[in-house]
Amino acid sequence: MQDVKVWDLFVRLFHASTALVFLLNYFVTEDGSALHSYLGYGLLALLGLRVIWGFIGGYHARFKNFMPTVAGVKEHISAMFFGEKDDHLGHNPLGALMVFNLLGSLALLCTTGILAETDMFWGMKWMEDVHEFLANYVLISVALHLLGVAFETKRSKINLVKAMITGKKNMPLN
């Protein structure tokens, strides 16, 4: 096994900050409070920076380098099902799908939160309902993400949590 640098500091700080802001807004702040709004705007700013970093960041941070394909997803699922070795230095295909799922759903969550505060949508229950649905959808996605990380860590014997903290994956020598 060999430590290989994968996740740059920006990606790791983005990941931790996004998780913290979402969890604070979901579990701690009061809906509609100033703090809830400020954290939502902060989350949107983080997402904007991550999109920029997805084009100019390091190799494994760039979207073009982990675009999932149907064939890649099928191969990865097959390897999981049949217990075959299928190590990925960056995101595996299912992990890549989850990245895009979370980035998109968090962006929609922020957008509906902002819209709910505008004159056009103020007090409209359906907008609040969409915002709440998206918050719950993100929470379920986060739970699935954590289950996927735990499963893949056990399956591959590569500690993905440690990799996100240190930026280095302990990869098998080929």
Show where each model-derived region lies.
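Membrane-embedded alpha-helical bundles that constitute the cytochrome b-like, heme-associated redox core
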Residues: M1-N174
